[in-house]
């Protein structure tokens, strides 16, 4: 049987890069990893709590963390940075304080910067959030998938595959439905494929959304 590998891990070092850039002694590695997870969760929770965009999309593409001996540099890639840049110094300062409280890192400086994503709907995380918002508002899953594909087509992608699994439309038996538009060559290593797996809670239970976007071939 075919083994389904994560497309991002499969392409690390060729078309994908690590989102955490730091070195550590083997014994301290797990601590560093947990620290990264705390930073990411804290930022996502802050954005979720304080952001009210009509589409319900937070627009976090990914969060990059670079660590040196005395500095932690966090770069947030946002699709819709209006929320954080409106009251920029105040909002970012507040976010920094929140993250520092969570980490309890007194002897290290924390810098947070924001980078705008040119085509937000080229990023599967942003797209998954959009679909999740639609499903929570009880829009039919087929309609939500169709709309998501239309949004990516405007971003000049070469192909997209969307899969939603769970109790679709409140049916008793869980199933998976998927739709593909264009090419999605998962076995081609030089093909740059963005992927994300996202969980959404609806009134019928938990649904899993998976999105593969074929951006370009190198």
From Swiss-Prot:
Transmembrane segments: none annotated. It is found in: Plastid, Chloroplast. It holds the Pfam family Ribosomal_S3_C. Keywords: Chloroplast, Plastid, Ribonucleoprotein, Ribosomal protein, RNA-binding, rRNA-binding. One of its GO terms (molecular function) is rRNA binding. GO terms for biological process: translation. GO terms for cellular component: chloroplast; cytosolic small ribosomal subunit. Disulfide bonds: none annotated. PROSITE patterns: KH_TYPE_2, RIBOSOMAL_S3. Its main location: plastid. Residues 43-118 form the KH type-2 domain. InterPro entries: KH_dom-like_a/b (IPR015946), KH_dom_type_2 (IPR004044), KH_sf_prok-type (IPR009019), Ribosomal_S3_C_sf (IPR036419), Ribosomal_uS3_bac-typ (IPR005704), Ribosomal_uS3_C (IPR001351), Ribosomal_uS3_CS (IPR018280). HAMAP family: Ribosomal_uS3_B. NCBIfam families: rpsC_bact. Part of the 30S ribosomal subunit. Belongs to the universal ribosomal protein uS3 family. This is Small ribosomal subunit protein uS3c. It comes from Populus alba. The lineage of its organism: Eukaryota, Viridiplantae, Streptophyta, Embryophyta, Tracheophyta. The gene is rps3.
